[in-house]
């Protein structure tokens, strides 16, 4: 896909992977709309990315349709690429598990994501084209200690991705999941303060590069899943 002039929505675009991806897309000539919960962070992201913004919480399930329609309206009814990047993570031992924590994470990582995508897909079907990028995690590949909530949400997203691939390929809609390993972003920080780059860890720019590469493949093909690891994070 040639990104010049394409309409792209990036959820969770005010920080980290979403912000870097939005900037890279704008630099490629795409029309980009980023969503996020904090108007203050979104306003800062505008200066960095050059993207349009809209503030809403993807976990607000009851208003998903209204919020999606606002996004669609800002693009005059055409969406070429949807990047489902908004995500939430917690670490809890088995003894600490609660339904509130499960719902808090799943409402963002699974339920809100799926219902927002549901609103965008009919446009792509009419267009007979489109690309959906789900930002997963290497936590979707193998469980780990204290990962009961977060990892299971990413396992669920991986399954959604595979189901959508089977369902949407006949409509020329490509669905890809990008699974980053540890990235130096604000992810997991309750104050949403971005971490300093560490020389041997992945940064948001590497993940943005992976996302752009998957999108820019000619539409006759697609990458179904891409795992992104730091080369040597062990030192």
Task: Identify the residue ranges that each predicted region occupies.
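C-terminal helical subdomain
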Residues: 170-171, 177-178, 185, 193-235
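Conserved glycine-rich cofactor-binding loop
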Residues: 14-15
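Residue(s) in the substrate-gating loop at a strand-loop-helix junction
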Residues: 137
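Active-site helix of classical SDR
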Residues: 117, 153
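The beta1-alpha1 cofactor-binding region of Rossmann-like NAD(H)/NADP(H)-dependent oxidoreductases
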Residues: 56-67, 99
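Substrate-binding pocket helix/loop in short-chain dehydrogenase/reductase
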Residues: 93-94, 101-103
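Active-site-adjacent segment of SDR/Rossmann-fold oxidoreductases
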Residues: 142, 163-173
